[in-house]
Amino acid sequence: MVPVVALVGRPNVGKSTLFNRLTRTRDALVADFPGLTRDRKYGRAEIEGREFICIDTGGIDGNEEGVETRMAEQSLLAIEEADVVLFMVDARAGLMPADTAIAKHLRSRQKPTFLVANKTDGLDADSAVVDFWSLGLGEIHPIAASHGRGVTSLLELVLLPWMDEVVPQRELTEEEENAAYWAELAAKEAKVNGEATADEEDDFNPLDLPIKLAIVGRPNVGKSTLTNRILGEDRVVVFDMPGTTRDSIYIPMERDGREYILIDTAGVRKRGKVTETVEKFSVIKTLQAIEDANVVMLVIDAHEGISDQDLSLLGFILNSGRSLVIVVNKWDGLSQEVRDEVKEALDYRLGFIDFARIHFISALHGSGVGNLFESVTEAYDCSTRRVNTSMLTRIMHMAADDHQPPLVRSRRVKLKYAHAGGYNPPIVVIHGNQVKDLPDSYKRYLMNYFRRSLDIMGTPIRIQFKEGDNPYEGKRNLLTPNQQRKRQRLMSHLKKNKR
């Protein structure tokens, strides 16, 4: 599972500033996710290839009434669902009673906690943080989040070693009891994602790996009904009330000779409507299920249309690089006029998702469900397809011939060669001169050209650009013996002319 890091502290100590610093390292989705109270934000971040989910919480006001009664509920939940806590204090304001109360609560929870003193810019850090040693939380890590000072050290010297040593151990569902099976599955996944050696890849076929399919969406859109329809049994509790599913449920299954692991998730609800503690915990599990899946099936209610919550969830899926199938449920019973209106709205709001298949189904009655797995397998096969360097380079040159790269600083951008940089999602790495200066419009053109040429559907494509290093940069040009003789003759000639 992806580790979860919570930022906790009093109001205005710089939690959101640090949150933006952390999530910006990977252009993560930084937004107030639906299903969460106003003071909690979730984002994705990365340290040297190690991904984690970061939670920004609202300020905690631990006054004379006690931290247990005054601590904001969303901050309490963030502490509980986190694997590690970054407790932030204000070095300029000094130690406050609320800091002491929060530290006491954190010690009682026995969570791994690192004390971070923010706003140390312009101060003698050692003197400014001396009072915070009384909190009894160990070493203090001074930073200036607004300027980025100390943030890299915090990541590399604190969080990264912790992530390397402590793998979050979470409760497994009944279907995950066979540890050997899951260990073997993880080893195979490493090969799918391009982490295997060349010898291992030669005898590995992605078709041997079960496809992990996550079914996600807002509450009461019919996710569990769809799961039961696919399985042909009442495997998941279904009741006409939002929030029936409380956790992500992993269900192995087989269809048409191919193995799948179905992940039925809890719904991501509109903020302000999440009241029960257990339901709030399920949101983070949904996000982790998306990270863990190969293909994500986003279920939308045809009666309600696509909402802002659907778009926010869609944004997280795209940032995760997961393959996508869009399912519009409860299609039965709608008049043709209403169906046309729904399709028109989908075209308008999902115009930027041109690679995902859209299915209109009725999970309750089963209409259209049988066609879903064609799109699921298509998306997975496209995301794990191996393409050699020669083919990618040929496609790149064809794209450049059809539409030349633009001029950058009066020089034509030169595309040299392309190769695969990873799978699931497919990554194409293009090498050349000034390629990083290409405008976004031409980058989109290349991405769409690769998609059409490789006939890729159901999965996003990522293109990375690399420029070759100049081998002579910073080096003095050494003259050949012949050039040295010519230089001596020229210097002698110039001296004679001066006389």
Curated annotation (Swiss-Prot):
Pfam families xrefs: KH_dom-like (PF14714), MMR_HSR1 (PF01926)
Domain EngA-type G, chain residue ranges per copy: 3-166, 211-384
BP-aspect Gene Ontology terms: ribosome biogenesis
Listed CDD domains: EngA1, EngA2
Binding locations of GTP 2: 217-224, 264-268, 329-332
Keywords: GTP-binding, Nucleotide-binding, Repeat, Ribosome biogenesis
Signal peptide: none
Entry binding sites for GTP 1: 9-16, 56-60, 118-121
Keyword Cell cycle annotated: no
GO molecular function: GTP binding; ribosome binding
Domain KH-like: 385-469
Entry function: GTPase that plays an essential role in the late steps of ribosome biogenesis.
Similarity comment: Belongs to the TRAFAC class TrmE-Era-EngA-EngB-Septin-like GTPase superfamily. EngA (Der) GTPase family.
Subunit annotation: Associates with the 50S ribosomal subunit.
Alphabetical list of PANTHER family matching this protein: GTPASE DER
Listed name of the protein: GTPase Der
Organism: Erwinia tasmaniensis (strain DSM 17950 / CFBP 7177 / CIP 109463 / NCPPB 4357 / Et1/99)
Lineage, highest ranks first: Bacteria, Pseudomonadati, Pseudomonadota, Gammaproteobacteria, Enterobacterales
